[in-house]
């Protein structure tokens, strides 16, 4: 018989874990139930670790909620990028890969925000290419910042390097027209 657990945060049930878990992750103690084994399950952005300890079981749960709003630019990281891209389905996704210290990145940021308000059928994301996100930046093949990647169906279909606003608009228009005709 499958075990179904409903975890509700309460001050007595949750305490921060130590040793490598982010602040969003909590440790919850629940009574021991038969059928609970040491296992990890990943469901979307939620990761559950079941560990049997004595007469109780420990469930470590990480649940991150990422809201992608129309007309907004959503900040992503190495953990949230691909789930959001997959959730976008057939929508066009535009990713701004930037750094905090990049002058051209700062100049184009307000224009990028304006594009997110103009193209409400497109998902606009931004990724800070800091050391923590370096694996994703490397996976996406970044060489310079800013770099804009345009994705459709989980695949990069266009790339614009540098703060070239007109080139970015043209790439978005091309991807949108290819999307509507194909």
From Swiss-Prot:
It is found in: Plastid, Chloroplast. SUPFAM superfamilies: Thioredoxin-like (SSF52833). The active site is at 102 (nucleophile), 105 (nucleophile). Residues 1-22 are annotated as: Disordered. Residues 52-177 form the Thioredoxin domain. Coiled coil: none annotated. It comes from the Eukaryota. Keywords: Chloroplast, Disulfide bond, Electron transport, Plastid, Redox-active center, Transit peptide, Transport. The record marks 96 as: Deprotonates C-terminal active site Cys. The record marks 103-104 as: Contributes to redox potential value. The keyword Amino-acid biosynthesis does not apply. PROSITE patterns: THIOREDOXIN_1 (PS00194), THIOREDOXIN_2 (PS51352). The keyword Repeat does not apply. Disulfide bonds join 102-105. One of its GO terms (cellular component) is chloroplast. Participates in various redox reactions through the reversible oxidation of the active center dithiol to a disulfide. The F form is known to activate a number of enzymes of the photosynthetic carbon cycle. Forms a complex with heterodimeric ferredoxin-thioredoxin reductase (FTR) and ferredoxin. Belongs to the thioredoxin family. Plant F-type subfamily. This is Thioredoxin F-type, chloroplastic. It comes from Brassica napus (Rape). The gene is TRXF.
């Amino acid at each position: 018989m499958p075990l179904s657990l409903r975890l509700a945060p309460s001050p007595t049930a949750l305490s921060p874990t130590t040793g490598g878990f982010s602040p969003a992750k909590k440790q919850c103690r629940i009574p021991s139930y038969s059928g609970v084994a040491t296992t990890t399950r990943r469901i979307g952005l939620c990761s559950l670790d079941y560990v049997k300890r004595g007469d109780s079981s420990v469930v470590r749960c990480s649940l991150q909620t990422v809201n992608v709003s129309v007309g907004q630019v959503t900040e992503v990281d190495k953990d949230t990028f691909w789930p959001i891209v997959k959730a976008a389905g057939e929508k066009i996704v535009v990713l701004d890969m930037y750094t905090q210290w990049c002058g051209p990145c700062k100049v184009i940021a307000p224009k990028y925000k304006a594009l997110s308000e103009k193209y409400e059928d497109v998902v606009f994301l931004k990724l800070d290419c800091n050391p923590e996100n370096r694996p994703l930046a490397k996976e996406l093949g970044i060489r310079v910042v800013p770099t804009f990647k345009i994705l459709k169906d989980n695949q990069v279909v266009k790339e614009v390097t540098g703060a070239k606003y007109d080139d970015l608009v043209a790439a978005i228009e091309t991807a949108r027209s290819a999307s509507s005709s194909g």
